Amino acid sequence: MRVGVLGAKGKVGSTMVAAVQAAEDLTLSAEVDAGDPLSLLTDGGTEAVIDFTHPDVVMGNLEFLVRNGIHAVVGTTGFTAERLAQVREWLADSPGTSVLVAPNFAIGAVLSMHFAKQAARFFDSAEVIELHHPHKADAPSGTATRTAKLIAEARKGLPPNPDATSTSLPGARGADVDGIPVHAVRLAGLVAHQEILFGTEGETLSIRHDSLDRTSFVPGVLLAVRRIREHPGLTVGLEPLLDLG
């Protein structure tokens, strides 16, 4: 398969360029970065693209890719329900084209979200702490937002988190994502980390994942690239490719 990389000179993008070059069954067709024309992808006969760019440009990238029948594996964050609806609308006019958008491609991170969803209904309280390098554009992270939504979905019909806080500084209790507090830390020296905390009477449970290097995203991204054609339309999250349900 001929694979292009968008955001090829970024920290994650350059890691993906090296990964595609090292894969015997993949051919690097184009390296595209800020200021480069997207036509480099079509000129190179690109069949699938890995996009690790920026929330400000990713939608324009996807519109171009879908209209040209190029499959997309997207690790760029900032996808709202409205943005996903727009991608579905584009895909409706391009049957057979596939887009996979995932907040995290580290297998361990995907598993931690799955474990959190399973655990959520057994505990009274749940909170999420995500920790990233200070250059990250969005807060909270897409992974933390999705984790909180999965927990909230699993807890439907249960009482809300017990919390007697009546006075606090703005933001002290984190962002509210469907009733789940999410706290974002930005600190030099970090890459990508998340801890999910559960509590009930007499016990707590912590589920933590640490990406210590950006190479942690490679296995998940390459899995998505190799299987993207099996999932026409829009897929959100890596879970369907891991048969997690």
Curated annotation (Swiss-Prot):
A GO CC term attached to the entry: cytosol
Descriptive protein name: 4-hydroxy-tetrahydrodipicolinate reductase
Keywords from the UniProt entry: Amino-acid biosynthesis, Cytoplasm, Diaminopimelate biosynthesis, Lysine biosynthesis, NAD, NADP, Oxidoreductase
Enzyme class: oxidoreductase
EC number from the UniProt entry: 1.17.1.8
Chief place where the protein resides: cytoplasm
Gene: dapB
Naturally occurring in which organism (per UniProt): Mycolicibacterium paratuberculosis (strain ATCC BAA-968 / K-10)
Pfam assignment, any one: DapB_N
HAMAP family associated with the record: DapB
